[in-house]
Each structure stands twice: as C-alpha cells, then as structure tokens.
C-alpha cells in the first residue's frame, strides 16, 4: 500500500498532463484564443503542450521523476500567474491550484526519499 499510493499519484499526474498537452497541441476549442488573450505569442500552445508531454513522460521513471515534477511545477506556476493576472474565474483557477497541489505533494514525497516504484 505504501508504494501503491505514490505510484497511482504519479500515474494520475502523468495522465492529466498527457491530456492537457494533447489538448494544447491540438489547439481545440478556445485554446489558441485563450493563449492569445493571455498575451502569449502565436504557437505558444504548441510549446506548452510539448513541455507538458515531456514532463508527463519524465514522471514515469523513478530516475527522472524529480525533473518531471520540476518542469511541470514551473509550467503550473506560469499557468496560475497567467490565470490570476487576467482575472480568470474560479472555475479555471480551482483545477490549476488542485493540480499544483498534487505536484507539490508528489515533490515533497520524492525529496523526502520516498521509494516511488517505476510504473510498468
């Protein structure tokens, strides 16, 4: 049970960022318009989506997990700053803060030396 919870947390975070990365890369819905409204240059959704996919992949191996958490933490910090700066509604802020909180929890566990089993 001790290894199962961290493994499930890493898998869940990886899935969240795979989906987010795919949505950002696809530019579906209002993605491109949102990035433009937040002041990012054209095509930044591709950069962000690509980095989210890289971060998700890094979470899947115990040897790269720290770097995945660091990369995704920076991405989420930037996302939260953009959302706050543009006074986005709570319905956009709440998921961002929840995901950032899960990333922080995972990072604390990794830095404390928790043995996160590699996903297989």
Where are these predicted regions, by residue range?
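Membrane-interface extramembranous regions
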Residues: 1-120
């Amino acid at each position: 049970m001790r290894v199962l919870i961290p493994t499930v947390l890493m898998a869940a975070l990886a899935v969240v960022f795979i989906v987010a990365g795919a949505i950002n890369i696809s530019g579906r819905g209002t993605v491109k318009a949102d990035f433009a409204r937040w002041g990012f240059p054209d095509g930044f959704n591709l950069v962000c989506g690509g980095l989210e996919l890289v971060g998700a992949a890094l979470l899947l191996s115990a040897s790269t997990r720290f770097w995945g958490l660091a990369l995704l933490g920076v991405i989420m910090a930037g996302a939260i700053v953009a959302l706050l700066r543009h006074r986005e509604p709570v319905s956009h802020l709440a998921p961002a803060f929840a995901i950032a909180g899960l990333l922080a929890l995972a990072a604390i566990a990794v830095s404390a030396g928790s043995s996160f089993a590699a996903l297989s």
